[in-house]
Each structure stands twice: as C-alpha cells, then as structure tokens.
C-alpha cells in the first residue's frame, strides 16, 4: 500500500514539474512539387511570428525540414524555391508537440523554366573587336530580376550599367571569372541548362554565404549531382535567332539509399539562323557528376563538364555598308567557297572543368565546404592574315563609295565616277564575291605566287588566335550559427592561372608555306633581317625565318601568369524583425608576362645582360623611354603585386513577415586585370604606367513585398568606380604607324532606380507584371593617355589629359543654327554635355500580362528602351583631334569631334506560350513557345564602337574628320520552340 502511494505521489510530482515548464514543440514537413509530387530540395523556408523572423532553414535532398524548440503559438512559414511560385502557410504549435505539416506543395513557375539560357553565352565574344555580356542572371525569387533578366537581355542590357566583369559568378563555390579579363565565362557551361539550373543569387553589394562578391551581385551554381532534378529529361528545341536545332538529354538519380547520387547530361546545338548569314553553331556539351554522402557529417562530390564546339561570328559594319546592301544584318565575315558559305572568323573552344568538393556538417549549427577546381583546354578564334597584299575584308573603307566621293569637298574625295562604280558593284549584285570574302581570289593569289625555289608562298592565310588556360582554384567556406542571434560566415579563394597566348596557322589557303616575320616591321626595317623576326632564336639557329606549315605557332607566344588569394568573413546579427550584417575581405593579386619567343624588334639583353646586335651591326636592344630599362619580348616581365580589401554593411527590417526594407553599403578595391595592364603583350613586356587598384563605393536601399500572389520590389542605387585603366592598339593615321594607347584614371558614376512587380488582376489567374530600370551612368573624370609606337615603343604622348572624355562644351546657337559669338568673335559657351557609359539602355521598361491556369501559361510583354550610347574612343576626345592640322580648336570642330552618339529609342513586343501535361504523376510532357520582337523591328542598334582613325588629308588642312562608326543591330522577329519530356 505504501509502495503504491509513493509511486502515485512521484508520478504526480513529475507531472506538475512538466506542467511548470514552458511547453516547446516544433514544425516539420516535406516540400514537394504540386505537379509530380517530387521532393523540392534546397527550398528556402522562413519562420516568423508577427513582425519577427524566428528562424530560417532549407530543405534537404528529400524535401524535408524541421524547426525544433518552438514555444507554443501561431507562426508563418514562407517557402521559396527556384522555379516555383513562393507560398505562405500559417501553423499553430501547442502542447509542446512537433507539428507535422506532411506535404507542402509548390506550384511550378513555368514561364521561364524552359527557355534556353544559352542566350547569355552568345554575348561572350570579342570576335569583332567588341565585347559584351549581360549582367543579370535569371532570378525567379526576385520579381525584378525574373522579368528584367529575360526581357531586357534582348538589347544587351547591363544591370545598373555595370560591366559584365563586375558580376561574381561561381561554380560549387569557386569564382569562375576569367583571370585575365574578369569576364563572366557563361560559355563554359552553355548548353548544360539542366545541370546548371539551380542557382543561388544575391544582388548588389550583398555578401553571400559562399563569397564576398563585389557591387554587382554574386551567383553560385552548385552543379553537383544532388542539385540536378531527379529523373530523365529530354528536350528538342528550334529557334530562328541562334541555331536551328538543340537536342538535350539529362538523367539524375537523386539521393540513393546507399548515399550515392549520379547525374549526366549531354546536348548538341547545330545549324544557322534566319537573320545573319555566316553565323552558325556546331557545339556540343557534356556533364557527369557523382556524389557520395557517407553520413550526415561527410559528403564528397565530383563533376566534369565541357562545351566543345565552334560557332561562326558576326562582324559590325558601318551604316554606309548596311545601306548599300539594304540589310542591317549584313555580316562581312563570310563568303562562298565552292558554293558553300565559309566564315573567316570562327570561335573554337573546348575547355573542360573538373571539380571535387567536400562538405562537412558536424551539427545543425555548423557547416563547411571546400572545392578544388581545374579548368584547362583550348579557346581560339580564326581570322584572316596577309602579307604584301590588299586588305581582303569586303567592307574595308577603300572598297566603299565614300572613299572616292563625299559631298563635303574638304574631305578631298571628289571622284564621282569611281564612287558610282563602287556603289554599282555593291548594289547591283553583279558579283557576290565583291561584297563578301572572296575565297576564290585568295586561293588564286596564293597559287600564283611562286618563289625562287618553285614553292607557293601564301600571301593570305587564316590564323587562329589562341588563349589556352590552365586555371587551378581552391575555395572554401563555412557557416556557424553561434546562437539565435549571431551567425558567422567566411571563406577563402585561391587561384593559380597560367594562360598561353599565341597564334597558329590554321589554313594556308592553297599555298605551300607562310613566312614567320613581322609584316609591319618589314615596312621600316627591311634592311635588317633580324628586326623582322618573330622568333630570333629560330633565325639564329637556322639562318632564316621559319617557313610555316599548317598548325605551326607563329607571330607571338607568351604566358600570362596570375596569382590571387583572398580571405573574407561576415557576421550576421538577428533580433526579432531586425537583422544586420558586417563583412570584410582582404586579398592579394600578382601577375606577370613570360615571353616564350624573342622578337627582333624587342630583343632585350642576352643571357649575360649584354646588348644584342644584328649581323650588320645594327643594335637590336631598345630602351624604355620612361624607365631607361631594356625592353624585352622574351622572359619574365616585372612582377606586379596588389593588395586588395573591402568592407560591406547591411541593415534589414521586416514588417509583418511579408514586407522588408533593407540597405547595403560597401567599399572595395580591385587589382587591375592582366589584359588592361600591358601596353602590347603580343610584342613586349612593357607595363602601363602608374597602375593602381580600382576603387569602388556602392550603396542601395530597397523595399520588397512578398505576400501571396503580390510581389514587388523598389530599389535605389548609387555607385562610383574610380581609377580604371584601358588599353587598345590601332593604326594612327597621323603617325602612319600601328600604335598602342593606354588610359588611366577612368572614373564612372552609376545611379538610378529599379522597380519590379507582379500583382493579380480582378480576372482569375491573370497577373499584371512589369519592370523598370532608370539610371544615369556617366564618366566623371578626364583620364590620362599614354601612346607608343608598336614597332619601336617610341613615346608619342605621356600622361596627357583627354580633355573631352568626361564631357564636351556645347556652344550657343541662334534659331538658324549658327553660333552666337561675343564681341571678340568667339563662340559663346552654353553648357557641358555629359558623356555616358555606353552599350546599355539607361532607361528600360517592361509591362505585360501573365496568365496561368491548369499548367497553361501565356505572357504578353511590351518593352521600351532609351538612352543608349555608342562606345567612345579616346582619340576623338583629344585636343589634337579637335584642333586639326592648323592647331586651332573651333566650336564646330569640338562639337563634331567630341560628341557621343545617342541611339534612338526602341520598343519591342514579346509573347510566351506554354503548356505541360502530367501523366500518372510520373511523366510530364510539355512545350514552350517564345516569340521575340513580334513587331519585326530591324533598325534597333544594340551596340557598336567608334573607329580610331582620322581623315587627315583634307583640302583646307584646318580640321580632321572621323571615320564612320560601326554598329550591331537587333534581329527582326524571331521565335524559339522547345518540346520536353520528363520521367
């Protein structure tokens, strides 16, 4: 009896103790796709109570999540995932139990999911002396990026006016931006849409969990097997703007019971397009990944991928050429050979990427990972090269009517007969070979050029300019949640890059050999054979220049060495609805050039440090006019080293769990890139004078709403970029020589607003959506210019101010357009006209309707673009270009020479239609059809550049004239149709 009483009292006391404690429970569940009930991995889930954010987590590979240790009460769950519409769920925790939500389904967001992301890769080409990349990746979880990232890319829109180099792009945590140029290399995985579909993106100056980033966002593509959508997927795509056919097949096992995951993908892109002759694709892609999860703590992943292939390039031309042929899509790079199109400029690439990643997760509060990545292979593009022969380009300025006759008599071009004759040849189409590359003529010239030994010495050849990288990277990151309020994140990046830059002889075009000598040097130094040599060591060993065969290296050959390392860390503080972050980074960058051949023009010193002489006694060693040191093309250049650093801060306040206000601020420095640090890396080791790090300041403030079907974001941003450098090489008509030009101290300011929204209308399943980007991106300094002659390093100008780069004066005119002058006869100043960062619309807007019902989607979007400007060259903004031969600057000369061309506004109409069907919840078949530029606008300039040449043989000898600018135009109406099948 006593024993029973004791047990009863003990049980009662235990129960009272339990009742006295605060009951704690939790929430668990599984996130699945509403379409096929498959698990949604890496979904982001935010738990809030009122205006306070309690916790955040992500789903595992099976779609599961858990929020433990929650006090009783009502909570909101916001679930977000790539390619799905965000959703909000209310949940109540009571009696200390863990509430199981079981399956929480997300509706697929299909509007953009099936479109071909390889559009981005097509901007990654410098084949025309013009380079451009988009700087917005698709961002389904941000309404502005989701709309602008697709709709604005048509006109080569740059996010906030920033260059593509400013965007931090990573694979499995490794920064992939090119070591030499900083460019985002989208082409390395173009065609692998399924394998690279999952992305984590952070905007502006925000610091990510996987990298510090810059001022233009950071994106990570996990790329390993467990991130590829489970199952089989095949698709067939055709489009009229890029290539005729794309075939793609992908398989992913998903996580298996034994901890392994596998994924494979392959694709082919083939054919030409409806608009630009000579542009074609013959590209393939492959991907394989395996992953082993040993337990909840250790995971090892490996991946291997590449996109081998080739594509024909487009070239820009002047408006005169486009008007002569009556087609703004004219491409001067191709011609007929034996009845078939042949493009002279073809990009050929095969750059495999191999990576190995280890993830370490000892607890829910700590995780870390490290990735080793190696990029290698070849990257080249072909071009025509010639010696002692006429320029083979069909749109060369001497082939055009304007070369013979101009209405302005001061041009000294007054031969109307020859102009009419040239125009007749272009417009009547008597001989198509005259307006395209005349391959037959090139072969005939070579096959009729016998040397004394009866061999055919080619005057025309096709070269391939190679940039072959060996790029090793090691990156790591960690995240530690110290308690409910503090989280510490950090990591490191290290890179060792060695890139070989050289040319090979791709095609002798019917000849037997081509001589490895410097064509420009032959014009000045023909009497000294050693001066002409591209490879003095070969000449010394053999007594003559090398007779080149197909596949031989020639011209130039050097290594670009780049080393970099950095550390970064971020501390996050969260309390209720308030969060704050502070982050910092420090790093070091070093680079140098290693010449692999000794060039006759810049022989340097011999192994004993002595001067080198030619056999006729001519001194081959030359000296830098600034440093007094011997200029060498062979061996190592000076090693340049830079210390970089940065700091960022962020504040965020959530209002009711559906709305947030946040801001970012950052200051960071960047080392100048290798490609913008050497005056002429093809020929010598000379560096740009006074290289300093680029200094960036950025700030933004944002308001965002995500509530049910209502999505909106408004942002304002301000960024300054200071102390940039740039280099170029061009033919200087005034010096009658090929020259090198370096600019330093280029400053920019970018400021503006962004708006994105998608809101429901009174009509069921119909949404109003739109995006707006309005900014002012201007130059804020007049840089300094140094110019040297390429063949001799002779100094033409040293650190001279380019006075009309930032702006130019505009003078007052009367109603008749005549200049108003003061009492002394001088034109009266009116205002300064700003000069703008080029090649992107500074006003871009989109408004449209989106309808979604029963797995149908239909979108109509109208876009408007304005305030886009032509890329400027510094020569036209100098005093001597504006002054002319008489060295007198008139108001008319300044305004003519220094002004920047503004493109006309443009508008577009785009339509997207798609439908998918699910069969037995196991299979999915669907299609998406996209029509762009439905109104068939063919006069929209998307970019271009000013030529760097001057008309100097004028009648008056008082002024210079510009050469015509060159442009790219938007394709007319085009479509894309994709049919896919999943199981």
Name each model feature, range by range.
Residues 25-26, 238-271, 275-314, 346-365:
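Transmembrane beta-barrel wall of Gram-negative outer-membrane proteins
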Residues 136-137, 143-147, 174-205, 217, ...:
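Short acidic/polar hinge/loop motifs at secondary-structure boundaries
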Residues 291, 299-357, 380-463, 527-552, ...:
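Acidic/polar loop-and-plug regions of large Gram-negative outer-membrane beta-barrel proteins
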Residues 316-321, 536-547, 590, 601-629, ...:
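Surface-exposed extracellular loop regions of Gram-negative outer-membrane beta-barrel proteins
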Residues 329-353, 357, 627-642, 646, ...:
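Outer-membrane beta-barrel signature, preferentially recognizing the C-terminal barrel domain
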Residues 461, 487-656, 681:
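Signature of Gram-negative outer-membrane beta-barrel scaffolds
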Residues 717-720, 741-876, 980:
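Gram-negative outer-membrane beta-barrel transporters
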Residues 721-723, 866-889, 915-983:
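C-terminal beta-signal and adjacent terminal beta-strands/loops
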């Amino acid at each position: 009896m006593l024993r029973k009483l004791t047990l009863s009292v003990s049980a009662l006391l235990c129960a009272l103790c339990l009742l006295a404690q605060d009951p704690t429970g939790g929430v668990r569940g599984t996130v699945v796709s509403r379409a096929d009930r498959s698990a949604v991995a890496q979904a982001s889930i935010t738990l809030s109570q009122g205006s306070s954010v309690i916790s955040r987590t992500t789903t595992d590979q099976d779609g599961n999540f858990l929020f433990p240790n929650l006090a009783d009460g009502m909570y909101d769950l916001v679930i977000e995932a790539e390619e799905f519409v965000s959703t909000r769920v209310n949940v109540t925790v009571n009696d200390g139990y863990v509430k199981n939500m079981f399956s929480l389904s997300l509706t697929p967001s299909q509007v953009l999911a099936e479109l071909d992301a390889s559009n981005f890769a097509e901007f990654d080409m410098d084949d025309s002396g013009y380079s451009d990349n988009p700087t917005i990746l698709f961002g389904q979880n941000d309404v502005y990026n989701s709309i602008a990232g697709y709709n604005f890319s048509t006109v080569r829109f740059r996010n906030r006016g920033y260059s593509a180099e400013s965007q931090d792009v990573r694979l499995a945590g490794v920064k992939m931006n090119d070591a030499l140029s900083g460019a985002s290399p989208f082409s390395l995985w173009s065609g692998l849409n399924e394998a690279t579909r999952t992305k984590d993106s952070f905007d502006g100056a925000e610091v990510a969990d996987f990298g510090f980033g810059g001022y233009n966002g950071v994106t990570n593509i996990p790329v390993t097997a467990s991130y590829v959508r489970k199952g089989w997927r095949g698709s067939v795509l055709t489009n009229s703007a890029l290539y005729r056919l794309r075939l793609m097949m992908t398989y992913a096992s998903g996580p298996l019971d034994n901890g392994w995951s596998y994924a494979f993908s392959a694709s082919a892109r083939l054919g030409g397009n409806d608009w630009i002759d000579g542009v074609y694709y013959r590209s393939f892609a492959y991907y394989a990944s395996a992953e082993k999860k040993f337990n909840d703590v250790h995971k090892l992943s490996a991946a291997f991928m590449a996109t081998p292939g080739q594509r024909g390039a487009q070239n820009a031309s002047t408006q005169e050429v486009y008007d002569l042929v009556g087609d703004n899509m004219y491409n001067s790079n191709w011609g007929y050979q034996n009845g078939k199109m042949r493009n002279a400029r073809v990009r050929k690439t095969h750059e495999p990427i191999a990576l190995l990643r280890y993830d370490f997760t000892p607890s829910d509060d700590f995780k870390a990972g490290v990735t080793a990545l190696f990029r290698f292979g070849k990257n080249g593009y072909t071009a025509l090269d010639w010696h002692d022969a006429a320029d083979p380009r069909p749109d060369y300025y001497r082939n055009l009517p304007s070369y013979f006759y101009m209405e302005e008599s001061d041009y000294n071009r007054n031969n109307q007969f020859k102009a009419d004759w040239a125009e007749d040849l272009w417009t009547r189409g008597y001989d198509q070979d005259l307006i395209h590359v005349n391959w037959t003529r090139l072969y005939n010239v070579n096959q009729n050029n016998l040397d004394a030994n009866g061999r055919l010495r080619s005057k025309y050849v096709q070269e391939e300019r190679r940039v072959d990288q060996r790029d090793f990277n090691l990156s790591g990151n960690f995240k530690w949640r110290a308690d409910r309020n503090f989280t510490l994140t950090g990591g490191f990046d290290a890179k060792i890059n060695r890139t070989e830059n050289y040319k090979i002889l791709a095609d002798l075009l019917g000849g037997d050999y081509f001589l490895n000598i410097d064509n420009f040097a032959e014009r000045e130094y023909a009497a000294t054979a050693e001066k002409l040599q591209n490879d003095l060591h070969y000449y010394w060993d053999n007594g003559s220049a090398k007779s080149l065969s197909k596949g031989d290296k020639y011209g130039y050959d050097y290594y670009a060495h780049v080393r970099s390392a950095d550390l970064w860390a971020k501390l996050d503080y969260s309390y209720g609805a308030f969060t704050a972050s502070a982050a910092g980074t420090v790093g070091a960058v070093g680079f140098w050039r290693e010449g692999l051949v000794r060039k006759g023009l810049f022989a340097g010193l011999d192994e004993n440090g002595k001067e080198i002489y030619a056999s006729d006694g001519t001194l081959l060693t030359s000296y830098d006019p600034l440093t007094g040191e011997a200029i060498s093309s062979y061996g190592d250049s000076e090693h340049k080293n830079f210390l970089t650093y940065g700091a960022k801060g962020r504040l965020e306040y959530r209002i009711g769990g559906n709305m947030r206000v946040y801001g970012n601020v950052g200051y960071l420095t960047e080392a100048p890139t290798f490609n913008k640090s050497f005056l002429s890396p093809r020929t010598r080791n000379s560096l740009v004078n006074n290289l300093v790090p680029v200094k960036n300041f950025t700030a933004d403030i944002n308001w965002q709403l995500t509530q049910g079907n209502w999505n909106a974001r408004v942002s304002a941003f301000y960024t300054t970029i200071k102390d940039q450098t740039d280099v170029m090489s061009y033919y200087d008509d005034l010096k009658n020589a090929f020259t090198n030009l370096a600019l330093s101290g280029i400053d920019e300011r970018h400021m503006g607003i962004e708006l994105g929204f998608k809101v429901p209308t009174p009509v069921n399943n119909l949404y109003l959506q739109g995006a707006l980007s309005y900014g002012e991106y201007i130059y804020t300094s007049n840089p300094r210019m140094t110019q040297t002659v390429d063949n001799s390093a002779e100094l033409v100008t040293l650190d001279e101010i380019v006075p009309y780069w930032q702006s130019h004066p505009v003078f007052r005119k009367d109603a008749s357009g005549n200049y108003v002058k003061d009492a002394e006869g001088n034109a009266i100043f009116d205002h300064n006209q700003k000069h703008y960062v080029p090649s992107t619309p500074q006003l871009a807007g989109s408004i449209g309707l989106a309808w979604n019902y029963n797995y149908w989607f239909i979108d109509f979007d109208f876009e408007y673009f304005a305030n886009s400007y032509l890329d400027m060259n510094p020569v036209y903004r100098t005093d001597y270009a504006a002054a002319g031969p008489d060295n007198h600057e008139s108001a008319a000369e300044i305004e003519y020479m220094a002004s920047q061309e503004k493109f006309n506004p443009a508008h577009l109409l785009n339509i997207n239609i798609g439908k998918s069907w699910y069969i037995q919840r196991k299979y999915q078949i669907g299609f998406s059809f996209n029509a762009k530029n439905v109104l068939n606008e063919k006069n929209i300039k998307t970019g271009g550049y000013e030529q760097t040449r001057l008309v100097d043989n004028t009648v008056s000898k008082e002024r210079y004239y510009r050469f015509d600018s060159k442009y790219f135009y938007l394709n007319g109406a085009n479509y894309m149709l994709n049919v896919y099948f999943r199981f």
